[in-house]
Amino acid sequence: MKQLSSAQVRQMWLDFWATKGHSVEPSVSLVPVNDPTLLWINSGVATLKKYFDGTIIPENPRITNAQKAIRTNDIENVGKTARHHTMFEMLGNFSIGDYFRDEAITWAYELLTSPEWFDFPAEKLYMTYYPDDKDSYNRWIEVGVDPSHLIPIEDNFWEIGAGPSGPDTEIFFDRGEAFDPENIGLRLLAEDIENDRYIEIWNIVLSQFNADPAVPRSEYKELPHKNIDTGAGLERLVAVIQGAKTNFETDLFMPIIREVEKLSGKVYDQDGDNMSFKVIADHIRSLSFAIGDGALPGNEGRGYVLRRLLRRASMHGQKLGINEPFLYKLVPTVGKIMESYYPEVLEKRDFIEKIVKSEEESFARTLHSGQHFAQGIVADLKEKGQSVIAGQDVFKLYDTYGFPVELTEEIAEEAGMTVDREGFEAAMKEQQERARASAVKGGSMGMQNETLQNITVESVFNYNTSQLSSKLVAIVADNAEVGAVSEGTASLIFAETSFYAEMGGQVADYGQILDESGKIVATVTNVQKAPNGQALHTVEVLAPLALNQEYTLAIDSNRRHRVMKNHTATHLLHAALHNILGNHATQAGSLNEVEFLRFDFTHFQAVTAEELRAIEQQVNEKIWEALEVKTVETDIDTAKEMGAMALFGEKYGKEVRVVTIGDYSIELCGGTHVGNTSEIGLFKIVKEEGIGSGTRRILAVTGKEAFEAYREQEDALKAIAATLKAPQVKEVPHKVEGLQEQLRQLQKENAELKEKAAAAAAGDIFKDVKEVNGHRYIASQVSVSDAGALRTFADNWKQKDYSDLLVLVAAIGDKVNVLVASKTKDLHAGNLVKELAPIIDGRGGGKPDMAMAGGSNQAKIQELLDAVAGKL
């Protein structure tokens, strides 16, 4: 077996499949593009769904890739096991309706055992297969596998929901008896027993059926095009090739671990408890790549996952004695390890470090708050004479503040208490079940549409005209190809079309289809890309249409031009965001409609009013400069040399269109644009908002819509000016300032009146002094409008020696508010209010001299007042 670095293993995989006629698909962003079914790209095949379900026919049906992926359903196991990771690389080879079982198995065996490639010892390889899949069993024997190395497994059938499915055959590497202390042998494989001896390195899925949950597996229909979908974990392959005990002792992780050793002063011991080293090494990889791909820490979705990973890694750093932000210092190491195939981490190093460090500092503050919360729980339990911290409280510390259970146990131990571990585990399990139930499943590929897949006629989109004559080359009605159609809805393909198919965030063209006499025979209501790339026109048929006849295609030119203005404005906006917010503010989605444009971008905070003003100003300046908009067609490498901005995660063909706007913007784009920015006229941002963790959205309008938006604002200002009796709009701010000053004066006068009224009322209340056990106290119900008035009473009470203790209760709305104030050390206001609050079904707390509580049971107010004496 060859000794190879991880970079060499990855490259050898890609090189081998290239020799078998496969196209190498580059790894795409971990953040899915145009796929709302996925939180993360979680497998090598996830980026190829559109090929497998037949939505798009690939240029080459043979594909190979090395795809970064994230799975976070078992975060707690990372660091505990030898092979659990949050981020991993999946190596894959795929056939979309081309080769099948025989080639897939033959080539897999060649790649693994040939001296030219990985050169694995054949006797170390074992294969599992689906019992009914005799073809795979026979093929393995034909390529040279000993029958004793073939294990039937009932679970070897891949399906997730509706869509492509089929048997799979898995390849395992036997690491020997040293990893099988009980000498169980092949039963480990046959009975699917968790073990470290037989390591699964590759799974080959033979996708030959269209799964249908409504029928038994035996009734699944054969796919019109059978596919091969395989996955081999790079980390596992590298561990086997490098003879590592676990995946962490490979060159993918050890450089990170060595850096952690330097930062902590601790040493990684392969045979010891190294969980903290492993957690940090794993999690910083996920954080570096995910943030580099535009995901940012937050409180929901992807953001919550990243925040949880960072906090878990940070806590494990503390276990190693690192008590300051340190994870950001590991980003360059991650970048260097992966640089040969993933240069983006080093390219975005400064931004990634900034986000990680900021989040670490924020967590340090949160952790401090959590310690206060934990200490409060301990104090409450001590007062009640209890000694067990409830599982729900332990879970809240874990989930909200990032406290590991061990830290809570330490705090409990110092206080002579214990932790309800069982209750915590139950709360944790409940959360995991909720997460799994709500997790978006992304495995199903959807049903293949055989009719559309089989339409291979050529169709060309003409960018340069709004009307042309073209031959009708395909008609689809009721999901079948037909020769003619006379009514209803149909889908049409023409040899050439002027209609733009919805793509790249630009909506489709609408328009009409006319016959030779000029009669309208159909209206076009939608245009989408067919699997083989043709423009598929959805039409309402008004008169008979026949195959191979010439028709005139006329788009709604006014509608198209309005969309073009918005699309070009989107490019200007993207450039302005880079200039004003920074290069990290990259496109995360867009929609160029008729009446507006919507642009989503990555940014870690709300855009300020000043920034929005600067962005809007810059876009308008470029419009008024009347910059020429040019489009050129070239190859992808030349386009990148020109400096064209490619959207990360998007796939581009060999030929691409480059759209340049003067020397201000240059992007790859297949959409339609105005010829000069002056055609846009005017640009106005109407809304900016957050739509998810680390993602912002701008809604804007151009041209006539922008003018109308400004006019609406002007009309509103004029109406305000009239109300304020301001002669001119520009005087409105001055008038508003005057009103604000009047309001402040009235509020001040109102507060003074309240104080006088409170003082008058206090005169009566403070006379009602009682005494018990040598303590003078006042306990009374008062009528006030808010809790602040209770504090005013207390302030007045403090001015003179009325009593040692003051207890005031007020019914405000449907709630009860309680204030306790004390002037003596032996009467603790905070403790007393905690004892009184449960009477009104409430909770409270505070300082020795002042405390407050809130409750809901107004019927128990008198009972609370009567109870005061018994507490003294």
Curated annotation (Swiss-Prot):
It is found in: Cytoplasm. It comes from the Bacteria. Its cofactor is Zn(2+). Pfam families: DHHA1, tRNA-synt_2c, tRNA_SAD. Keywords: Aminoacyl-tRNA synthetase, ATP-binding, Cytoplasm, Ligase, Metal-binding, Nucleotide-binding, Protein biosynthesis, RNA-binding, tRNA-binding, Zinc. Transmembrane segments: none annotated. GO terms for molecular function: alanine-tRNA ligase activity; aminoacyl-tRNA deacylase activity; ATP binding; catalytic activity, acting on a protein; transferase activity; tRNA binding; zinc ion binding. One of its GO terms (cellular component) is cytosol. Binds 1 zinc ion per subunit. Belongs to the class-II aminoacyl-tRNA synthetase family. PANTHER family: ALANINE--TRNA LIGASE, CYTOPLASMIC, ALANYL-TRNA SYNTHETASE. Catalyzes the attachment of alanine to tRNA(Ala) in a two-step reaction: alanine is first activated by ATP to form Ala-AMP and then transferred to the acceptor end of tRNA(Ala). Also edits incorrectly charged Ser-tRNA(Ala) and Gly-tRNA(Ala) via its editing domain. This is Alanine--tRNA ligase.
